[in-house]
Design a protein with these regions (language model features):
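Structural signature of the two symmetry-related core transmembrane helices
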Residues: 17-31, 245-261
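Helix-breaking motifs and short loop linkers at transmembrane-helix boundaries and internal kinks
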Residues: 14, 35-41, 52, 69, ...
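Multi-pass alpha-helical transporter architecture, strongest
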Residues: 133-139, 257-266, 347-378
Length: 378
């Protein structure tokens, strides 16, 4: 929720300094988490970590929007979001290696007795402070303009003003609204995917640490391939067809949907099963560049960070919450009714997420008209 306020703030102030503040803030409270003595002392720092994290993506996307041409924004936004598949991969690899008693001794020592969970928080916090302060070395050209012009538009922009402009954009641009809606439906699938590793262990017979390691390796390469493919091809699609990038996601989702269904029911020794696993991480990498670039292109420049913050609020608060909570409830309700409750729950939420397909199609068809209307209005 704080992201909406931080997004509006990013449209008014020096963005490099704001990113530095946000990263340093959450890094300090990450270190504070390592000193926690109980639930309250762990929960309170997490709240401030969320405030700091809410600054990064809206502000970064706004910076990218000002420094990359529109026809290359799909790749730029996708490359920024490369952190998602890589972060998932690293976490799975760490979980797999730490849980596996056959892991290399140096890994067990480093992540276990030598540092411990508190030490991990301290280490990440110190690293974050260093990275945050390094942002002060980058200059925000727009920030310089704000300082030198006392009557700039950014100075005049208030939070309520930004919300009015955003609401007007949502009313007047079906492409914007449907791109956001498609993102929400996709994140319902991602929310349900919190049970993916449990499904692989409980209903497909994998060892927990082994499948975590395998998934981590797949996530690295498939995620990277997805980021490059999604960014470059969606930019090419827009340039050659003048159809919005969501049309690219429409075709991608439509083509990959049958494989996503089939691999839920085949044996893990078959090729189609592993193709399905790879495609899941590949599609994740493809998603972010086209959608984040599109939502920025369909609003006035002065609220780019605000619309990104609103988009993140929607996909997290609605998409991930509905997906994770709904799938968990469905698993509990179907245990004892179905032999494989995780399989059916993931499949059902996969079909719910498939509602992204018509959303992206209509958004892509409307894109050129809505973009032209925006440029005329400006």
């Amino acid at each position: 929720i704080m992201g909406l306020f931080m997004g509006a703030l990013a449209d008014k102030v020096n963005r490099s300094k704001l990113i530095a503040f946000g990263v340093v803030l959450w890094s300090i409270f990450t270190m504070a988490s390592g000193a926690a003595k109980g639930f309250i002392t762990l929960a309170l720092p997490r709240m401030f970590i969320g405030v700091g994290e809410s600054i990064l993506t809206p502000t970064s996307m706004s910076l990218l929007g000002d420094n990359f041409p529109s026809k290359r924004m799909g790749f730029a936004a996708g490359f920024y979001y490369l952190g998602v598949p890589l972060g998932v991969a690293v976490s799975l690899l760490l979980v797999g290696f730490v849980a596996d008693i056959k892991s290399p001794i140096f890994l067990q020592g480093l992540l276990g007795e030598t540092i411990g969970w508190r030490g991990c928080f301290y280490m990440l916090g110190v690293l974050g402070v260093i990275l945050g302060l390094s942002m002060l070395l980058f200059k925000d050209k727009r920030g310089t303009e704000i300082v030198t012009s006392s009557i700039s538009e950014e100075e005049k922009l208030t939070f309520s003003g930004a919300m009015k402009i955003l609401a007007n954009a949502l009313r007047n641009s079906p492409a914007l609204t449907l791109t956001i809606s498609g993102g929400v439906f996709y994140h319902i699938v991602l929310g349900a995917a919190a049970f993916e590793q449990i499904w692989l262990v409980e209903e497909r017979g994998f060892d927990r640490s082994v499948i975590a390691q395998i998934s981590g390796v797949i996530a690295v390469f498939a995620g990277l391939a997805g980021v490059l493919f999604g960014g470059l091809v969606s930019d090419w699609w827009l340039e050659k067809t003048n159809q919005g990038r969501p049309i690219f996601l429409f075709w991608l989702s439509l083509i990959l949907l049958p494989i996503g269904v089939m691999y839920r029911f085949v044996e893990p020794t078959t090729i189609i099963f592993w193709v399905g696993v790879v495609i899941g991480y590949f599609q994740l990498g493809c998603f972010y560049g086209p959608t984040f670039s599109t939502v920025q292109e369909l609003v006035p420049e002065k609220i780019r960070a605000t619309v990104v913050a609103f988009y993140i609020l929607c996909i997290n608060l609605i998409g991930l919450t509905v997906g994770s909570l709904g799938a968990g409830i469905l698993v509990d309700l179907t245990k004892g009714v179905f032999e494989e409750p995780y399989t059916w729950s993931l499949l059902i939420f996969g079909f719910i997420g498939a509602l992204e397909i018509p959303c992206f199609y209509i958004a892509g068809v409307r894109y050129a008209k809505d973009k032209a209307n925006l440029e005329t209005a400006v």
